[in-house]
């Protein structure tokens, strides 16, 4: 029975929208921004109120059924003598064709469940959809890969990186949130359905383990069972060549469901394969992790993410330094910017306390109503892609005085002209579950890029402001520079995307590491080439 038809839909947030995927057409996804997930809690609170009323009604109905049961049971226990009392005979004759029919065909249960069903239908469009469940599952796999997380630990609510015999705690939650067997099954099934057995098998193994512990217990909200998990895991093992594992799991399945003819045929098939090629199929097979989308720099990228900020400090390299920066601007004379040079090639600087808490909150509030799934330039088009999971909004400086003040501060700090069309509007980004942006350049690398539609050249510089803190993950990794910068709330990260010659600086290839725990907000200001001719003059030195 699907979750749309079960009371489970009222109990598990990400399963609330599971049903007909077509019903979600035109609805904004939830998993790609945490602010969208937070909004989904409001309709769930309304559903909890409806469920509470339903439970009270059911409790009253069950008390009445218990009363009827006790009454009839007491009559049976008292019948030590033949039924001769005419009153007793009458009640028996009435009870069998009438009372029992009323009990069995009572509409009270149907009427009780109608209220939560109606309440669910009213808020269904505001709930996460089937695609969100898939997106959330893929996010867990992304975190599993990027931070080398142990699946068993994740299921127990523990964030640990496991490398060989070494275990490193990446994050210690104040309150543990463990996953159920059905939760693990759903994650494994998402991977299984795309042929990704590298991720499917450990999640399905954990589901089988948890289902075994609770076998015989019935949970309304569960969609899957031990038999389902064994079925999927057995076939996944077979698909990767581990026939011995597939046979063992299939035999276990038949213990619980001995009449399943399909599984019985599978057992015979696996036994025959092992008899014919036992030396090839009995051993456990190493499964290669899929590299989709293809990413040549994946190992470097994930290594930098795992270090959670690997840049050297000015204590280690004397050429790196900290200073108070005025840039010869009267605007910064009384309140200089607190500059920390993070790296020299590419030149990357971090400006601490670039915005205040109040300014950061205001910018988030201005952007939130306008957030839409982030896109990337692909040729002449802009597309939603798996390698960028976030939502973004664009804010003009006329929206609020705080944005005017921010633009003045950016102009004073950089010495650049940031008035349109020489700079883009402020882009505000909120990252979702495991939100990330895989290695990319901010500047255009193709002459057909949509960036050139502004008629102001390529993106010469980037200023990225961290509008929030995170508890773990979310660092900015510079791949070829081989360093990463952790999230520092209210700080701004600045770098040049282009050499003075106008050529792109390949060393600026960077990525937003997946957010392990936390709600990551950033604001990007991209400043273009045109308008900066006398502020950053051209130079033929390719290294400048």
Curated annotation (Swiss-Prot):
Q: Which GO terms describe its molecular function?
A: iron ion binding; L-ascorbic acid binding; procollagen-proline 4-dioxygenase activity
Residues annotated to bind Fe cation: 440, 442, 510
Any idea what this protein is called?
Answer: Prolyl 4-hydroxylase subunit alpha-3
From the Swiss-Prot or TrEMBL record, state where the protein is found: Endoplasmic reticulum lumen
Modification after translation, per record: N-glycosylation plays no role in the catalytic activity.
Q: Which family does it belong to?
A: Belongs to the P4HA family.
A matching Pfam family:
P4Ha_N
Relay the cofactor remark from the entry: Binds 1 Fe(2+) ion per subunit.
- Kindly indicate whether the keyword Iron belongs to this entry: yes
UniProt xrefs under SMART domains: P4Hc (SM00702)
Q: Which residues bind 2-oxoglutarate?
A: 520
Q: Does the keyword Endoplasmic reticulum apply?
A: yes
Where do glycans attach?
242, 482
Known EC number(s)?
1.14.11.2
One GO BP annotation here? collagen fibril organization
According to its UniProt entry, the function of this protein is described as: Catalyzes the post-translational formation of 4-hydroxyproline in -Xaa-Pro-Gly- sequences in collagens and other proteins.
For activity, the cofactor(s) needed are: Fe(2+); L-ascorbate
Signal peptide start-end: 1-24
Which sections of the protein are TPR repeats? Answer: 227-260
| Gene Ontology cellular-component terms listed | endoplasmic reticulum; endoplasmic reticulum lumen; procollagen-proline 4-dioxygenase complex
């Amino acid at each position: 029975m699907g979750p749309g038809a079960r009371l489970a839909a009222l109990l598990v947030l990400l399963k609330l929208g599971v049903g007909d995927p077509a019903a979600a057409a035109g609805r904004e996804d939830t998993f790609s921004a945490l602010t969208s997930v937070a909004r989904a809690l409001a309709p769930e609170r309304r559903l909890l109120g409806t469920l509470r009323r339903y439970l009270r009604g059911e409790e009253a109905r069950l008390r009445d059924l218990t009363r009827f049961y006790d009454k009839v049971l007491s009559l049976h226990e008292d019948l030590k003598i033949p039924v001769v009392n005419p009153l007793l005979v009458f009640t028996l004759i009435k009870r069998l064709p009438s009372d029992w029919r009323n009990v069995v065909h009572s509409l009270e249960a149907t009427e009780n469940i109608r209220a939560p069903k109606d309440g669910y239908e009213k808020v269904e469009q505001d709930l996460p959809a089937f695609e969100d469940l898939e997106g959330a599952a893929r996010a867990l796999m992304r975190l599993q890969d990027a931070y080398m997380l142990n699946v068993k630990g994740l299921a127990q609510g523990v964030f640990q990186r496991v490398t060989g015999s070494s275990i490193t705690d990446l994050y210690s939650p104040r309150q543990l949130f463990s996953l159920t067997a059905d939760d693990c099954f759903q994650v494994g099934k998402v991977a299984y359905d795309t042929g990704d057995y590298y991720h499917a098998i450990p999640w399905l193994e954990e589901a089988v383990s948890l289902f075994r512990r609770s076998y015989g217990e019935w949970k309304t909200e569960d969609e899957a069972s031990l038999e389902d998990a064994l079925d999927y895991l057995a076939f996944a093992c077979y698909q990767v060549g581990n026939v011995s594992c597939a046979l063992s799991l299939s035999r276990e399945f038949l213990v619980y469901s001995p009449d399943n003819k399909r599984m019985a045929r599978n057992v015979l098939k696996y036994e025959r394969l092992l008899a014919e090629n036992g030396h090839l199929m009995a051993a456990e097979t190493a499964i290669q992790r899929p590299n989709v989308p293809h990413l040549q720099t994946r190992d470097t990228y994930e290594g930098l993410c795992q270090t959670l900020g690997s840049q050297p400090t000015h204590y280690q390299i004397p050429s790196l330094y900290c200073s108070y920066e005025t840039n010869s601007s009267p605007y910064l004379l009384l309140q200089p910017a607190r500059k920390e040079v993070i790296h020299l090639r590419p030149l990357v600087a971090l400006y601490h306390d670039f915005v205040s808490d109040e300014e950061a909150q205001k910018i988030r509030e201005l952007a939130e109503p306008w957030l839409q799934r982030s896109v990337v330039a692909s040729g002449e088009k802009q597309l939603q892609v798996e390698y960028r999971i976030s939502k973004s909004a664009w804010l003009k400086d006329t929206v609020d005085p705080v944005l005017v003040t921010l633009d003045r501060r950016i102009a004073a700090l950089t010495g650049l002209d940031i008035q349109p069309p020489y700079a883009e509007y402020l882009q505000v980004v909120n990252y979702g579950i495991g939100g990330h942006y895989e290695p990319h350049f901010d500047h255009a690398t193709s002459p057909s890029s949509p960036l050139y539609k502004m008629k102001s050249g390529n993106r010469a510089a980037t200023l990225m402001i961290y509008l929030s803190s995170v508890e773990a993950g979310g660092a900015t990794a510079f791949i070829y520079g081989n360093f990463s910068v952790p999230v520092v709330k209210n700080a701004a990260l600045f770098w040049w995307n282009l050499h003075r010659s106008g050529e792109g600086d390949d060393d600026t290839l960077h990525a937003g590491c997946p957010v392990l725990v936390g709600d990551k907000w950033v604001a990007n200001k991209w400043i273009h080439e045109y308008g900066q001719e006398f502020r950053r003059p051209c130079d033929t030195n390719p290294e400048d």
